[in-house]
């Protein structure tokens, strides 16, 4: 079974940093994991991509030859990729029982305005038989501006509904969240599990009264759908990265269909059985 994780979110949310941290942790625990770059404008990586869209098409070349702007050029690059999926299939063909981390561009119009990323997710799931999921990152600094936070929740909801696959929402850069301006863990919790009713009054106090009705409509939509909550991500904490990886594994049912791997030395008579493990139940009696 093959697995693919689409790493999405707006520009500056920390997607590439998250990819690097996830790969480092996965390699530490012995997993075969590879980075796939789908950003034709990317130029720096902590890990060299195993598969790179720039080997197929480059944004700078498109902008120069077709005189497109950055966003138009990016959409053209993705359309070119989707018209040449045989290239991607050939690139992915050698990876069996592997875990692919797919770093996506930060232009959210790829899955909110035009159905490019959803088409790619469908291709991976149906044509190539990948178990596919997604993560969506927003910057923890959104918590400093409640209107911006609401916009982030809406974009996460849009991505989730557009992709049509299981998705985990992450509040990135939690290592930058300091206990200042009176912010407490309880207040941070209101953002991780958005409670629109608690936030509505604060927004209405700080915005023009003309927007109050719009704010109530947005809050009502978020509350009625109730599909977005955030897991805190601190890439400087191995425990935090491990927690995120565990949630991704659960979404894709990672490893449930894997066949036991036979040690190479078994046929040579050198195999030594590992110690037997026991399931010990602790019974606590009331005194």
Curated annotation (Swiss-Prot):
The lineage of its organism: Eukaryota, Fungi, Dikarya, Basidiomycota, Agaricomycotina. Gene3D superfamilies: P-loop containing nucleotide triphosphate hydrolases. This is GPN-loop GTPase 3. A motif (Gly-Pro-Asn (GPN)-loop) lies at residues 69-71. InterPro entries: Gpn, Gpn3, P-loop_NTPase. GO terms for molecular function: GTP binding; GTPase activity. PANTHER family: GPN-LOOP GTPASE 3, XPA-BINDING PROTEIN 1-RELATED. It comes from Cryptococcus neoformans var. neoformans serotype D (strain B-3501A) (Filobasidiella neoformans). Keywords: GTP-binding, Hydrolase, Nucleotide-binding.
């Amino acid at each position: 079974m093959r697995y693919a994780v689409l790493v999405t979110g707006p520009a500056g949310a920390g997607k590439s940093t998250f990819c690097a941290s996830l790969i480092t942790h996965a390699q530490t625990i012995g997993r075969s994991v590879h980075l796939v770059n789908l950003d034709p404008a990317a130029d720096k990586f902590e890990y060299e991509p195993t598969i790179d869209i720039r080997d197929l098409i480059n944004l700078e070349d498109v902008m120069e030859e077709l005189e497109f702007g950055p966003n138009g050029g990016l959409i053209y690059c993705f359309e070119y990729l989707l018209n040449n999926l045989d290239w991607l299939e050939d690139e992915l063909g050698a990876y069996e029982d592997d875990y692919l981390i797919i770093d996506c561009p930060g232009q959210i119009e790829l899955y909110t305005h035009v159905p490019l990323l959803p088409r790619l997710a469908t291709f991976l799931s149906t044509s190539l038989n990948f178990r596919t999921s997604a993560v969506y990152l927003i910057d923890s600094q959104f918590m400093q501006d409640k209107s911006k936070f609401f916009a982030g929740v809406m974009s996460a909801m849009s991505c989730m509904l557009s992709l049509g696959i299981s998705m985990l929402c992450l509040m990135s850069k939690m290592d930058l969240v300091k206990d200042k301006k009176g912010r407490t863990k309880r207040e941070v919790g209101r953002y991780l599990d958005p409670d629109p009713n608690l936030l509505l009054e604060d927004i209405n106090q700080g915005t023009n009264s003309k927007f109050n009705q719009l704010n109530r409509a947005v809050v009502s939509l978020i509350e009625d759908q109730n599909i977005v909550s955030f897991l805190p991500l601190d890439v400087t904490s191995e425990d935090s990265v491990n927690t995120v990886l565990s949630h991704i594994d659960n979404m894709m049912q990672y490893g449930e269909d894997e066949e036991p791997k036979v040690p190479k030395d078994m046929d040579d008579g050198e195999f030594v059985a590992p110690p037997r493990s026991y399931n010990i139940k602790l019974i606590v009696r009331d005194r």
